């Protein structure tokens, strides 16, 4: 059976780069897309801003402390969506097997491509060149035989990078990866893995599937496969994502009071940042909890206004927590997500975002 040829394309500082492209006075300067207000969140940061530690999803006030001369520019989501459509038109010159992950990121299956180009790396090179020439933006691309490795490859030489992970080099490459680089390993999961003496791909590969499933649930089986370079997920052009969410599994169970006062505010802030980055608009909030015995419960509420900021999300999340009949039980997992997208978003699959396996 022939190996698949998968490309992951990730635009470089997409929103911020568009602002620098359209506003010459911003070029070479640290800029952030967002509002410089007490309640503001950075939706995107230029590479100049990132050198000061400014990151997307960061509160604007914190960003200004890190970089006092940071320039804020308003979010122009209509422009970002239009540019995203232009980028996708370039992708479709080569294949219709395009799976959008967000406005600025997509997988392409070029195993059978329209021009009949034999090498995927040549297609990636052409796509990058056409994006630069036609849109005056840069993209990073990763090439490999599955989605997991293609995504890692696109991050490897950012910005404006191109990197290939060949099947013959995959095992050695994965073995040296820090555990944080694995898709699905966020801060909390990385801490739990380090507590189990798993800090890189080689140590992850040394663990059997039962061990990983016991400690990480269903995701443990995914980690087991990733450590072996196995990822059979197809590129799905019709995939429609209808929510934005984040969740965290805790190394030590948290009390109800800790959840209300400490954990939910952090999740609400993270969710607000993801909503800002994605441009997703929805008005249904879902709270997900998992108890130490792995019993899971959810509560949701739909409100008239669109949920975009921590200040709107957190009170509603706390209300849902109060309504949850949990008694004095502790929690091993908490999660928040916004769904029920507006009709205008259902018209374009690249206008939606779901960050999978983040924790």
UniProtKB/Swiss-Prot annotation:
<keyword id="KW-0460">Magnesium</keyword>
<comment type="subunit">
    <text>Monomer.</text>
</comment>
<keyword id="KW-0548">Nucleotidyltransferase</keyword>
<dbReference type="GO" id="GO:0006261">
    <property type="term" value="P:DNA-templated DNA replication"/>
</dbReference>
<dbReference type="GO" id="GO:0042276">
    <property type="term" value="P:error-prone translesion synthesis"/>
</dbReference>
<dbReference type="GO" id="GO:0003684">
    <property type="term" value="F:damaged DNA binding"/>
</dbReference>
<dbReference type="InterPro" id="IPR001126">
    <property type="entry name" value="UmuC"/>
</dbReference>
<dbReference type="InterPro" id="IPR036775">
    <property type="entry name" value="DNA_pol_Y-fam_lit_finger_sf"/>
</dbReference>
<dbReference type="GO" id="GO:0009432">
    <property type="term" value="P:SOS response"/>
</dbReference>
<feature type="binding site">
    <location>
        <position position="10"/>
    </location>
    <ligand>
        <name>Mg(2+)</name>
    </ligand>
</feature>
<keyword id="KW-0235">DNA replication</keyword>
<keyword id="KW-0515">Mutator protein</keyword>
<feature type="binding site">
    <location>
        <position position="104"/>
    </location>
    <ligand>
        <name>Mg(2+)</name>
    </ligand>
</feature>
<protein>
    <recommendedName>
        <fullName>DNA polymerase IV</fullName>
        <ecNumber>2.7.7.7</ecNumber>
    </recommendedName>
</protein>
<keyword id="KW-0238">DNA-binding</keyword>
<dbReference type="GO" id="GO:0005829">
    <property type="term" value="C:cytosol"/>
</dbReference>
<keyword id="KW-0479">Metal-binding</keyword>
<keyword id="KW-0963">Cytoplasm</keyword>
<keyword id="KW-0239">DNA-directed DNA polymerase</keyword>
<keyword id="KW-0227">DNA damage</keyword>
<feature type="domain" description="UmuC">
    <location>
        <begin position="6"/>
        <end position="186"/>
    </location>
</feature>
<keyword id="KW-0808">Transferase</keyword>
<dbReference type="InterPro" id="IPR050116">
    <property type="entry name" value="DNA_polymerase-Y"/>
</dbReference>
<dbReference type="InterPro" id="IPR017961">
    <property type="entry name" value="DNA_pol_Y-fam_little_finger"/>
</dbReference>
<dbReference type="Pfam" id="PF11799">
    <property type="entry name" value="IMS_C"/>
</dbReference>
<comment type="similarity">
    <text>Belongs to the DNA polymerase type-Y family.</text>
</comment>
<feature type="active site">
    <location>
        <position position="105"/>
    </location>
</feature>
<comment type="function">
    <text>Poorly processive, error-prone DNA polymerase involved in untargeted mutagenesis. Copies undamaged DNA at stalled replication forks, which arise in vivo from mismatched or misaligned primer ends. These misaligned primers can be extended by PolIV. Exhibits no 3'-5' exonuclease (proofreading) activity. May be involved in translesional synthesis, in conjunction with the beta clamp from PolIII.</text>
</comment>
<dbReference type="InterPro" id="IPR022880">
    <property type="entry name" value="DNApol_IV"/>
</dbReference>
<dbReference type="InterPro" id="IPR043502">
    <property type="entry name" value="DNA/RNA_pol_sf"/>
</dbReference>
<feature type="site" description="Substrate discrimination">
    <location>
        <position position="15"/>
    </location>
</feature>
<dbReference type="GO" id="GO:0003887">
    <property type="term" value="F:DNA-directed DNA polymerase activity"/>
</dbReference>
<dbReference type="Pfam" id="PF00817">
    <property type="entry name" value="IMS"/>
</dbReference>
<dbReference type="GO" id="GO:0000287">
    <property type="term" value="F:magnesium ion binding"/>
</dbReference>
<keyword id="KW-0234">DNA repair</keyword>
<dbReference type="InterPro" id="IPR043128">
    <property type="entry name" value="Rev_trsase/Diguanyl_cyclase"/>
</dbReference>
């Amino acid at each position: 059976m022939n190996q698949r040829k998968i490309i992951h394309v990730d635009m470089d500082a997409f929103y911020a780069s568009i602002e620098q492209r359209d506003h010459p006075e911003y070029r070479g300067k640290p800029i952030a897309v967002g509002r410089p207000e007490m309640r503001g969140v950075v939706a995107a940061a230029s590479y100049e801003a990132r050198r000061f530690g400014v990151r997307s999803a960061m509160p604007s006030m914190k960003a200004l402390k890190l970089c006092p001369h940071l320039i804020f520019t308003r979010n122009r989501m209509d422009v970002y969506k239009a540019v995203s459509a232009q980028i996708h038109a370039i992708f479709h010159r080569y294949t219709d097997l395009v799976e959008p992950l967000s406005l600025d990121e997509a997988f392409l299956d070029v195993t059978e491509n329209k021009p009949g180009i034999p090498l995927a790396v040549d297609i990636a090179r052409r796509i990058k060149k056409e994006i630069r020439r036609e849109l005056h933006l840069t993209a990073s691309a990763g090439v490999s035989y599955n989605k997991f490795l293609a995504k890692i490859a696109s991050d490897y030489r950012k910005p404006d990078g191109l990197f290939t992970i060949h099947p013959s080099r995959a095992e050695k490459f994965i073995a040296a990866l820090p555990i944080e680089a694995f898709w699905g390993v966020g801060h909390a999961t990385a801490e739990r893995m380090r507590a189990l003496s798993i800090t890189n791909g080689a140590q992850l590969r040394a663990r059997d599937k039962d061990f990983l499933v016991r400690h990480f649930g269903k995701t443990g089986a995914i980690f087991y496969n990733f450590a072996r370079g196995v990822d059979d997920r197809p590129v799905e052009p019709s995939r429609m994502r209808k929510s934005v969410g984040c969740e965290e599994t805790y190394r030590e169970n948290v009390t109800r009071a800790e959840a209300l006062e400490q954990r939910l505010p952090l999740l609400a802030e993270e969710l607000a940042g993801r909503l800002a980055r994605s441009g997703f608009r929805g008005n249904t909030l879902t709270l997900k909890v998992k108890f130490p015995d792995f019993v899971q419960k959810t509560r949701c509420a739909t409100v008239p206004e669109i949920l975009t900021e921590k200040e709107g999300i957190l009170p509603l999340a706390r209300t849902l927590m109060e309504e949850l009949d949990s008694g004095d039980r502790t929690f091993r997992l908490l999660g928040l997500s916004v769904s029920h997208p507006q009709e205008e978003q259902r018209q374009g699959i690249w206008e939606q975002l779901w960050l999978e396996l983040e924790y």
